Amino acid sequence: MSDTRAVVVDPEAPGRLVIRAVPGPVPDRGEAVVRVRALSLNRGEVRRSGMAAAGWRPGWDLAGEVERAAADGSGPRTGARVVGMLPEGAWAERLAVPTHALAELPDTVTLSQAATFPVAGLTALLALGKRGPLLGRRVLVTGATGGVGDFAVQLARLAGAHVTASARRADQAPALRTLGAHEVVVGDAIPPSPKYDLVVESVGGRTLGTALGALARGGMCVTLGVSASAEVTFDAREFFIAGRTTLYGFYLFTELGSEPASVGLRRLADLVAAGQLTPHVSLERPWTEIARVAQDLMARRFPGKAVLTL
C-alpha cells in the first residue's frame, strides 16, 4: 500500500514532533482502514513523546471515515463516519484500526467532537462505573477542567450524583458549575468534609493524599493520572478508619481488556447525539501545528481538549 503521513518523534525538531511519510496501513482481517479527519491530544502521549526515541509514533484518539471495511465483515461499513483509538500511532492520515476499537457515529455528532471521546471520554465513563450506580451518591472530580474531568463532571451529574469539582483557580468555578458541578473546591488540597462515595482523581500529589482522607465508608478513590506529582503522602489512619475504603489504580488500556472500546465509544456518541453530553473543544487547529499545540497543552494554556484536523 502507498505511503501515508504521520506524526513522529524527532528529538532535533522544535517540540520533538514532526509530520513525515511512513508506510501505509496493511490491515489484518479484523481491521478497517480509516482515513483520519480529526485527532485529539492527551497529556500522557505528549509527555511520552518528550522522552521517546526518534521515530516513535504517538497518538491515541482518532475520528474519520472508513476507507476500507474489515475483510472479516466485522465493524463499520466502507464510508461510515467513525471514532476510534489505538495504543499508539493514531496521529496519521490513514490507519488500520481493529474493529473492536471503532464505533460508527450518529449523523449529528461531528468528527471534531468525536475525536475527544476515546481516552478522555472512555476514562471518565469507565472510572465512574467502578463504584456502581451513582444515583444519590457524592462524587468528587479532581482536575475537573481537564479533558477527563470535563467528561466526568457531566457524566456523574447525568447519573444522578451530587458532584463536587476540584479546580486550581477560583475563576474556573463558573464554567464547572455550568458543566453540572453542584459545588467547586479550589486549590490543591481536598477538605476532609464532606465525605465522598467516589473520587475520580487525576492530579496526584497533595490532591490525591487529601482526597483519600475525604472518603466515606465504603468509598472508592479511582486514581488515573499524576498531572501535578507522582509522589503522594497521606494519612493512612484517615483512609482506613472510614471503613471499607478502596484505592483503585486505573489504566484505560488495561480496563479495555474487559470490554471493547467500541461499546463505550458508541454510548458516548449516543449521549452527545441526544444532547445529554457536550464535548468541549477549547482549541481546534490544523495538524501541521501539532508541535505548538502539544507544548501549549503541557503548559496548561487552555482547558479541556485540543483537536487537530487533517
Predicted regions and their residues:
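C-terminal hydrophobic helical "lid"/dimerization subdomain
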Residues: S2, E259-L310
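Glycine-rich beta-strand-centered segment in the early N-terminal region that forms part
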Residues: P23-S40, R48-G89
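NAD(P)H dinucleotide-binding glycine-rich loop of Rossmann-like/cofactor-binding domains
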Residues: R47, R81-G143
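Mid-domain Rossmann-like dinucleotide-binding core that forms the NAD(H)/NADP(H) cofactor-binding site
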Residues: A115-V186
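N-terminal Rossmann-fold cofactor-binding loop
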Residues: S166-A170, G187, S202, G225, ...
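A short acidic, Gly/Pro-enriched loop at the edge of an enzyme's catalytic core
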Residues: P191-V199
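Glycine-rich phosphate-binding loop and adjacent beta-alpha segment
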Residues: R206-L277, L310
